[in-house]
Amino acid sequence: MSISNRKVVIVGAGHVGSHVGYALISQSLADEIVYIDSDRAKAVAQALDLTDATNYLPVRTKVTAGDYSDAADAQIMIIAAGPLPSGNQTRMDTLGQTIEILKEVTASIKKSGFDGIIVNISNPADVITHYIQHALNWAPERIFSTSTTLDSARLRRAIAQEIGIDQKSITAYALGEHGESQMVAWSAVTIAGKPLSQWREEYPDTFGKLDLDALA
């Protein structure tokens, strides 16, 4: 009986790639992680940092720096490459720079033999994910964007802080594009399974005072 090695390749060893790697090792979601970065020294440093961190975790994960040839037998590739917005820039303002980086990344993916699933975090996340799908000419179900998952988490945290309850009791989602055009489906927000609108009617002095525009 063969045992599958849960191998993940992370493209981009910067701030976001660092957090992705730590999340994977701390939750024992990967047996092996390979960092790929245009700055080889940064990828090596990141791999060493995470390897050191595994000393304090119950499960060991092999973390190395490599290149696209290491993606051939990986199941998941996480793309976290690209510039961060600076000054008054929005995520969309970085689109041109990110596309130039992703041209090289997608060309390397084609040559690598990688045949798994791609999760894209590079911003503007949804637009870049669409670009990757077309650049690779892959079925869309093989390429995912993190999209508004972070925004949804922030929304639940903000509601929880305002009314003083555990955010795990809240179901709320930011919808649309991870950027300036996203929106909140307030009619679908529930707390402990009860619609927020009902809470606001029953408890006007607490839930009723929530500033939905500010929270969104």
Regions found by a protein language model. Give the residues of each.
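Rossmann-like NAD(P)(H) cofactor-binding subdomain of soluble oxidoreductases
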Residues: 91-156
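Conserved NAD(P)H cofactor-binding loop of Rossmann-fold oxidoreductase domains
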Residues: 81-83
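C-terminal substrate-binding/catalytic lobe of Rossmann-fold NAD(P)-dependent dehydrogenases
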Residues: 138-142, 151-216
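Conserved S-adenosyl-L-methionine
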Residues: 26-32, 137-139
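Glycine-rich Rossmann-fold phosphate-binding loop(s) that bind the pyrophosphate
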Residues: 13-14
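N-terminal Rossmann-fold NAD(P) dinucleotide-binding loop
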Residues: 17-18
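Beta1/beta-strand and adjacent pyrophosphate-binding region of the FAD-binding site
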Residues: 6-10
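Conserved N-terminal Rossmann-fold NAD(P) cofactor-binding segment
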Residues: 32, 36-75
